[in-house]
Amino acid sequence: MQTLISGWSNYLNKYEWTHTATVRLHYKISEISADKITTSLVRYKPINYLFYCVENDRYDINHIHLLLNAPSTIARDSIAKGLGKYSKSVSYFNEVKSNKAISWYCSKQLNLNIPYDLKFKEQYV
């Protein structure tokens, strides 16, 4: 299973990630829901491509980690708008400081049968 994690981590590290975000909703995020809201986000004008994974929390709820490639001027409110959610749903938003570190962090639980995907704007144009 470690091979899956290191494989994805190395693969993601090849992309130029500019921002990272965490999305927390007031309900458990299903695989279908995660797919729908991340598709909405990648279709949103400023986003070029993204990677997401849904991670479980302690209290039978979960959250989405996002890796984004977007202009440096993008803000938390823009991410929420692209997701079609309220701004507080984006509980964390920041520029990427280390591509290698964030690629590992966002792939660390991929062996736990969680939803994840890499999406490019060109897929949805």
Language model features with spans:
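Right-hand nucleic-acid polymerase module
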Residues: 1-62, 70-125
